[in-house]
Structures are given as structure tokens and as C-alpha cells.
């Protein structure tokens, strides 16, 4: 079904569906996310759209897509919005946008859009999600990501690759 919405992305779709199928039969690390993927390419090739279509086809719910625009997290302190402010700080009671979303709907597609624009603190959170499969929010609650699919998008290096392929006679 996904392939009829996304033309020319068969390899990416097959890779994602293979990961989901492996997870459904228990052939994945029980702690880590179902899969983690880096979609790299020029603006407009369907990186973010792929994630939206995947979320709609898998869950039939828009609540299952957690989209994080990493340009909003370029300042070092902004990462607290994802996991919640520590106790004693303003907004502590609200929790974090990412941890709240995963607590409510563990089977989610999380998109870190333009990951290269995020601060190193967001990269550290992402590493913890991918390595350990969990985060601790500002309230001290542990949130598991073992039923989530993590997608990062980027267009870093695309111009360089285009220049190389054109210089050797392709394109």
C-alpha cells in the first residue's frame, strides 16, 4: 500500500517493512526501537512525506506520528522541551513533548526532521533512545521506545554528492 503513495522509494520502503516484520515475529532486540533510519536527500524528494504515509498506513491514526523539527532545538537548553523540565523549574508539571507522546502511544513513528540542525543535547537524547531504548523524563519516569520507529531526515552532503556525480558523467 505504501508503494502506491511513494513512487521511486521502493528500497527505503522495503527496508522499513522488513524491520517491522522482523519485530512482529520477535526477531529484534526487545529493548531497542523497532528500527532507526536516516533518510538523506534533496529537499522535496519525500523524506518527511514517507514518514507521514508510513504512520497513516500502519496505525490509521495521525497521533502515531511524532514530528520534531530539529531547527527548533538548535539552542542547547531547548532539549528540555522533549523530556520535560527538571523538578523545580517552570513547566515541570507538563512533562516533555516527546516523552508524553510515547507514553500515550508507544507504537509511534518519531521523525527528527533535519537532524543536523539540532544541538548536541538532542543528539545525546537520540543516542540514548537508539542504544538503550528509553529516556527518563523530567519527572523521573522512564519511557520505553521499544515499539517506536525512529526516522531522522537530513540533506547534508546532498550538494556534494550531486557535484561528484555530475563531474563523472552521471546526471
PLM ranges: what are they?
Residues 1-171:
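AAA+ P-loop NTPase nucleotide-binding core of proteostasis motors
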